[in-house]
């Protein structure tokens, strides 16, 4: 089983409009509300793929109750309740544009943070892989993910970590390393304080920087150009076919689902990388975020090429 962790989930509200009118009333006919957050996108894709998944994280208030109720019934759920209210994230879709209004979210009390660590520790007993995704809510220390990774490592579980900025930096600088990280070029540049290109020789050098020591897998998304990956001392380039992109949002989360599934099933390097890329591409072909049409899985799978470089 795979445990997904979403520390700062949201109710994602979509308002489609033909035109967004400023300083006046905009009436919305069709409103969509879903359980949102990067980890919950991972959860949905794993469930649609057919893997057993357990979702956890922090929820609070009536919106927190709404969120848990709107997660697929096939998914096992064991969230931790806090006093603060789960946030809303609003997307206004007007014409070809998207305007977002994102709430900061609740501030987590220090005691709640400590109690969640105990909650997390108990959940580790029933899973093999942990996928931690997204931002930390206010109130938790910047190295909180390092604490989760430490507990998972002590329990002998694989950890896939998908976060960025100070939270990722804190994990990289700690002695407690995840199994997998999934930065893109922009995030690599931010971590190293210099521009990083998509040149394969440069990426090889970058991924051997001391900052990344001790991490088994580093998987770098190159968008339409595929993926570059380092597993131990071996480097791979994944070539992907051109596809018709409908909505790329959530493709990174779908990739995390594929990585987690590959670890769960002890797949070969090539199998893991292909599965991860295919699920990311399938998400990009759908209007709904964090959704894949498995009917198209094998056709895409057969088109991907993994090369050792």
Swiss-Prot record:
Catalyzed reactions: D-tagatofuranose 6-phosphate + ATP = D-tagatofuranose 1,6-bisphosphate + ADP + H(+)
Q: Which CDD domains match?
A: FruK_PfkB_like
Q: What is this protein called?
A: Tagatose-6-phosphate kinase
Q: One GO CC annotation, please?
A: cytosol
This protein's UniProt keywords: ATP-binding, Kinase, Lactose metabolism, Nucleotide-binding, Transferase
What EC designation does it have?
A: 2.7.1.144
* Species classification: Bacteria, Bacillati, Bacillota, Bacilli, Lactobacillales
Name of a matching Pfam family: PfkB
Question: Molecular function terms in GO for this entry?
Answer: ATP binding; phosphofructokinase activity; tagatose-6-phosphate kinase activity
The family assignment reads: Belongs to the carbohydrate kinase PfkB family. LacC subfamily.
**Presence of keyword Nucleus:** no
| Superkingdom as given in the UniProt entry | Bacteria
One Gene Ontology biological process = lactose catabolic process via tagatose-6-phosphate
InterPro entries recorded: Carboh/pur_kinase_PfkB_CS (IPR002173), LacC (IPR005926), PfkB_dom (IPR011611), Ribokinase-like (IPR029056), Tagatose/fructose_Pkinase (IPR017583)
Q: In which pathway does it act?
A: Carbohydrate metabolism; D-tagatose 6-phosphate degradation; D-glyceraldehyde 3-phosphate and glycerone phosphate from D-tagatose 6-phosphate: step 1/2
Q: What class of enzyme is it?
A: transferase
């Amino acid at each position: 089983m795979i445990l997904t962790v979403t520390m700062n989930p949201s109710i994602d509200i979509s308002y489609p409009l033909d035109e967004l009118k400023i300083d006046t009333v905009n009436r919305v006919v069709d409103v969509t509300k879903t359980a949102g957050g990067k980890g919950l996108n991972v959860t949905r894709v794993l469930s649609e793929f057919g893997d057993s998944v357990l979702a956890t994280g922090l929820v609070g208030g009536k919106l927190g109750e709404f969120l848990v109720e709107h997660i697929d019934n096939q998914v096992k759920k064991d969230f931790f309740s806090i006093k603060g209210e789960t946030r809303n994230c609003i997307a206004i879709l007007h014409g070809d544009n998207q305007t977002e209004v994102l709430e900061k979210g609740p501030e987590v009390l220090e005691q709640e943070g400590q109690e969640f660590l105990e909650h997390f520790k108990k959940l580790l007993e029933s899973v093999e892989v942990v996928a931690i995704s997204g931002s930390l809510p206010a109130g938790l220390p910047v190295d909180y993910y390092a604490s989760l990774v430490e507990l998972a490592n002590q329990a002998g579980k694989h950890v896939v970590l998908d976060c960025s900025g100070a939270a990722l930096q804190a994990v990289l600088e700690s002695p407690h390393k995840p199994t997998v990280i999934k930065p893109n070029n922009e995030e690599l540049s931010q971590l190293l304080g210099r521009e990083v290109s998509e040149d394969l020789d440069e990426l090889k050098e970058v991924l051997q920087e001391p900052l990344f020591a001790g991490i088994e897998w580093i998987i770098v998304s190159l968008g339409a150009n595929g993926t570059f990956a380092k597993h131990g001392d071996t480097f791979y380039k994944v070539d992907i076919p051109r596809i018709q992109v409908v909505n790329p949002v959530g493709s990174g989360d779908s990739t995390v689902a594929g990585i987690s599934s590959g670890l769960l099933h002890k797949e070969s390097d090539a199998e893991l990388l292909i599965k991860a890329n295919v699920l990311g591409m399938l998400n990009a072909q759908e209007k709904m975020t964090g959704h894949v049409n498995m009917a198209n899985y094998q056709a895409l799978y057969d088109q991907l090429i993994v090369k050792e470089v």
